[in-house]
């Protein structure tokens, strides 16, 4: 069993994406020196009701439902693997966390609050959570309660239209005392990858996270 949380204060990470980060990609990233790797976003209801199977010769772990693989991982990546959850309800998010942590398959769980794609936002997930901070924070609290103590909880957000709105949201998230790290995609919800990221806004957000975290005795919270 593993008893140490992953470290977010330094290193090279395979960042959380929505439809990228499957097992082959993660293993390749680790081979090239990644310190932590995020899996693809898996909607909470997709992992619920799955059967966990372990391949006897390779050790491959698969979560299967209706004859299809929903998620796969391997013990070799366990200390570095962050499982990414798509959710819009605390109850379902907690159940998803319990399922993927029941056999100590992952080092951390991450709530996606940044995906702007319709498949995510139509269900109230992803970037839609940015405008529902109460719900977002309740989901994080539920995930923290459901996760074993040594499994980290993190989340990913996008920038809100104004810096003041972004700083307020970040402060509310940090004050939940649930997260070890916050990933910030430096684009707003309507922006697409071809548009330059708003990197000039990152410094103030990072400084605000550090200030709030220190005030709450959470010096370990990273951005």
Protein language model regions, located:
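Flavin-dependent oxidoreductase catalytic cores
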Residues: 1-223
